């Protein structure tokens, strides 16, 4: 079972995916919590390039190919083996993030992205995608507050993008959800975290019949 979490910067994905993982584990499920870009040593090295705010010269097509390379390695090394063993895999971002950020956000042709995603994913697709939705002003406000309180290495290249960019990403996510309503569940990320967690648990229960 493969569940992915998506949303704009500052939507609360990391908090909510950890809460779901804990709930599933408490219910006796075997769970793997991972993320993209990253999730294994090689993919984490690629992540450091992709998210480093100093890498302003990174062009959209190179960015896209780095995401595809990271995904291919992560799937082969981490996700595919876990799924083969019957583990529930929870992934913070996956192929929909590439569609939202690199196609809707950057303007790369959707078919180019679908081709690369197909190669990188090798037939693996999520059973359920949780889209945490909030206004871009809310999400960026949270994200930048987090950055201001963080010390050490920072991964903020996307947080520094314009409001218009993030609006395109949000609109893209909502369009993707409309295209595949059977896979996506949209959760209001502006309410209290406990309410968000409850809505996610309900979605997992109703769509995948997993005790939470």
From Swiss-Prot:
Specify whether Glycosyltransferase is a keyword of the entry. no
SUPFAM superfamilies cross-referenced by the UniProt entry: P-loop containing nucleoside triphosphate hydrolases (SSF52540)
What are the BP-aspect GO terms?
dTDP biosynthetic process; dTTP biosynthetic process; dUDP biosynthetic process
Reaction(s) catalysed by this chain, per the record, are: dTMP + ATP = dTDP + ADP
Q: Where does ATP bind?
A: 7-14
Q: Which Gene3D superfamilies match?
A: P-loop containing nucleotide triphosphate hydrolases
Query: Could you name the Gene Ontology cellular component terms for this entry?
Result: cytosol
The top EC class, named as a word, is transferase
- UniProt KW Nucleotide-binding keyword: yes
A molecular function annotated in GO for this UniProt entry is: ATP binding
Q: Which InterPro entries match?
A: P-loop_NTPase, Thymidylate_kin-like_dom, Thymidylate_kinase
Assigned protein family:
Belongs to the thymidylate kinase family.
Which NCBIfam families does the UniProt entry name for this protein?
DTMP_kinase
User: What is the designated name of this protein?
Assistant: Thymidylate kinase
Q: Which organism is it from?
A: Trichlorobacter lovleyi (strain ATCC BAA-1151 / DSM 17278 / SZ)
